Amino acid sequence: MAARQQQKGTGFGVQYEDFVPKSEWKDQPEATILNIDLTGFAKEQMKVTYVHSSKMIRVTGERPLANRKWNRFNEVFTVPQNCLVDKIHGSFKNNVLTITMPKETITKVAYLPETSRTEAAALEKAAKLEEKRLLEESRRKEKEEEEAKQMKKQLLEEKEALIRKLQEEAKAKEEAEMRKLQEEAKANEEAAAKKLQEEIEAKEKLEERKLEERRLEERKLEDMKLAEEAKLKKIQERKSVDESGEKEKILKPEVVYTKSGHVATPKPESGSGLKSGFGGVGEVVKLAEEKLGNLVEKEKKMGKGIMEKIRRKEITSEEKKLMMNVGVAALVIFALGAYVSYTFCSSSSSSSSSSPSSSSSSTKPE
């Protein structure tokens, strides 16, 4: 038989090369001998099996080649009818596998007539045809089994690939969701931090504005207090000046010219008139001063507490009223002082203008 080769892959990167080894039958009187040429194979790389159901001998083997390739064969041979199955034996020598199949009846081919030889040749030909048919059927079955196995393997690989793809998609989806949740959590955290920072800044600005307002209020109150103290001091100074001028005017003697000379006499009428004229104003000024003094003393006693309450914005309506009264009293005293000063000045000027006329009338000679 001529050898033929065929390449097959398994999907794992290993390739098999199938081939049909050369075989030769020899018919001897004692036995039928089958020689198979297996060059390149070792004894351990082949296997011979007798199949009782089909009365056939199966010879298989495989050996590795280079680049992940394997060389293999699978041959089936029909056992002759008059063969002793229990005595079949084989040997491997010089790359040739020899299978000896002893016969039940020893034939002497040399002494057979011509007709017997023809029948033997026909039988041998029929046996070879049957062997060929069985071999082809066996190969067809093996091919079908191999295709079924390959199809099953392919389906299994496709199933595994599909499962692997689904797992990868699920993992990618899970990672995307996890990444999205992390980004959302980070964004929420940043937004919360930003909002908290804005609230802190707004609170600080509010505190600064309140503090500035308190400072302005304290400054205004301090300015008001200083202004009131200055007004009070000015009123007191004017009062002292007015009182000294009034006393000097009351005690100043009036000069009366007579024949004997001029005589200085006091003028009680002027004093009484001045007293009667300015008595009401003096009493009002005195009452205003007493009230202002009481309010100032009370403010001095409570001043520290009021200023502290103003800073804290805890001042009561009564304390506000007290501060307003202090301001009003100061203004009243200032107005009364101005009025008194104006009145005294007017009185002084009128008295001065009337003195020369009286003196001229009194110095008229008799």
UniProtKB/Swiss-Prot annotation:
Transmembrane stretches, start-end: 322-342
Bias type Low complexity, positions: 346-366
Residue ranges of domain sHSP in the record: 14-121
Function, in words: Seems to not be involved in heat resistance. Unable to mediate restriction of long-distance movement of the pathogenic tobacco etch virus (TEV) without causing a hypersensitive response or inducing systemic acquired resistance.
GO BP field: defense response
Each A- repeat, start to end: 129-133, 135-139, 156-160, 206-210, 211-215, 216-220
Gene name of the encoded protein: RTM2
Topology within the bilayer: Single-pass membrane protein
Family affiliation: Belongs to the small heat shock protein (HSP20) family.
Region (Disordered): 345-366
Keywords: Cell membrane, Membrane, Plant defense, Repeat, Transmembrane, Transmembrane helix
Recorded GO CC terms: plasma membrane
InterPro entries: A-crystallin/Hsp20_dom, HSP20-like_chaperone
Spans annotated as 6 X 5 AA repeats A of L-E-E-[SKR]-[ERK]: 129-220
SUPFAM superfamilies from the UniProt entry: HSP20-like chaperones (SSF49764)
Stretch list, region 3 X 14 AA repeats B of [IMA]-[RK]-K-L-Q-E-E-A-K-A-K-E-[EK]-[LA]: 163-206
Subcellular location per the Swiss-Prot or TrEMBL entry: Cell membrane
Domain of life: Eukaryota
B- repeats: 163-176, 178-191, 193-205
Protein name, UniProt field: Inactive protein RESTRICTED TEV MOVEMENT 2
